Amino acid sequence: FATALDTIHEKFPKPVILTEFACDAIPGHHALPSEMWSEEYQAEVVAGAIQVLRGKPYVIGHMPGPLADYRVAQSTAAPMGMAYRGMFTRERRPKLAAHSLRTLWRR
């Protein structure tokens, strides 16, 4: 991720604002250690991306997303016809990643 950002910035030396980065987390699915589809994993991925972005002087902003989970066509990549990438559930209840973001953004 960090290397790809640097490569793109070398080719296009402009300020960067990165939006819509996340991974899926099924609401209420928790696992320690974290595992794919868990809220812990989503929070770690988003926090890790933000740490990388904060270390790049050419990155002037970021906004993980989407805000909330949303319906999609059913497939093996979309359990129960949902995209679970949101920081909040479809009903707008915060997932662990939303709480993690609040902590990061208050620093």
Regions found by a protein language model. Give the residues of each.
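Substrate-binding clefts and catalytic carboxylate motifs of secreted carbohydrate-active enzymes
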Residues: 1-107
